[in-house]
UniProtKB/Swiss-Prot annotation:
It comes from Nitratidesulfovibrio vulgaris (strain ATCC 29579 / DSM 644 / CCUG 34227 / NCIMB 8303 / VKM B-1760 / Hildenborough) (Desulfovibrio vulgaris). GO terms for molecular function: small ribosomal subunit rRNA binding; structural constituent of ribosome. Gene3D superfamilies: Ribosomal protein S20. Residues 1-22 are annotated as: Disordered. HAMAP family: Ribosomal_bS20. This is Small ribosomal subunit protein bS20. Belongs to the bacterial ribosomal protein bS20 family. Keywords: Ribonucleoprotein, Ribosomal protein, RNA-binding, rRNA-binding. The gene is rpsT. One of its GO terms (cellular component) is cytosol. One of its GO terms (biological process) is translation. Binds directly to 16S ribosomal RNA.
Length: 87
């Protein structure tokens, strides 16, 4: 364990950031899962609304630095392509 005051502070900050990042990543997984479930059920309207929510969550996570912006763009692109293919 850290002995210096500054090292203790940095450790506490890193734990707080890790918890926040974990929550954001879990949220990303859940919104992507919502889109995929709607796609499996062939529900275009529900998939479209879930896609809007997923893209918002992914863009926000990318802007905060939780995920790389290209990763977010790739996931949004693939989900959009899948939603557009549903007849």
């Amino acid at each position: 364990m850290a002995n210096h005051k500054s090292a203790l502070k940095r450790h506490k900050q890193s734990l707080k950031r890790a918890a926040r990042n974990r929550a954001v990543r879990t949220r990303i997984k859940n919104v992507i899962k919502d889109v995929r479930i709607a796609l499996q059920q062939q529900d275009k309207e529900q998939a479209a609304t879930a896609l809007v929510q997923a893209s918002a969550v992914l863009d926000k996570a990318a802007s905060k630095g939780v995920v790389h912006w290209k990763t977010a763009a790739r996931k949004i692109s693939r989900l959009t392509k899948a939603v557009n293919q549903v007849a």
